[in-house]
Design a protein with these regions (language model features):
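Structured alpha/beta or helical-core interaction and ligand-binding surfaces enriched in interleaved
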Residues: 81-82
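Short linker/helix segments within small regulatory modules
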Residues: 61-65, 86-100
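N-terminal alpha-helical interaction blocks
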Residues: 1-65
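Short cysteine-rich clusters marking metal-coordination/redox-active sites
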Residues: 70-76, 103
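Low-complexity, intrinsically disordered/propeptide-like segments
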Residues: 6, 14-15, 29, 36, ...
Length: 133
């Protein structure tokens, strides 16, 4: 089967749905967090291309602890994996973590075919402390 951008993106998203469904709740993985706030700002390497709008996600204890997020570009088959960033935040006991990730996916850029996505994610992850017992 030949994989085009739509096929590869659909296969990736289906795998992500299965992995998200199998993930433990946030309260089990990281009981020290009452919540996690993830702020995403995107930047394109080409200034002539408009970057996707920023995203804000708040995760509460019952939420599945899955930290892989699809690239917001509709023609891209890549994603951003923040699993290690969240784990490092939990280990550090700091209230926030931030960093940059580059999408490793492929996008259809023009009639010549696919090219690397190169979208950069600038993220901030802020933890809400667990309530006192």
């Amino acid at each position: 089967m030949k994989l085009n951008s739509a096929n590869s993106r659909n296969l990736l998203r289906e795998r992500q749905r299965r992995e998200r469904a199998a993930a433990q709740p946030l309260r089990v993985m990281y009981p020290q967090f009452a919540s996690l706030k993830l702020e995403f700002v995107f930047a394109e390497s080409n200034p002539e291309i408009v970057a996707p709008t920023p995203h804000l996600l708040v995760m509460h204890p019952p939420t599945q602890g899955y930290f892989v997020f699809a690239c917001p570009c509709a023609d891209c088959d890549g994603d951003f994996d923040l699993t290690s960033a969240v784990a490092e935040l939990a280990r550090s006991r700091e209230p926030k973590a931030h960093g940059n990730l580059k999408c490793g996916g492929q996008r259809i850029r023009d009639k010549n075919g696919r090219a690397p996505c190169d979208l950069t994610l600038r993220y901030v992850i802020a933890s809400g402390p667990a309530p006192a017992s």
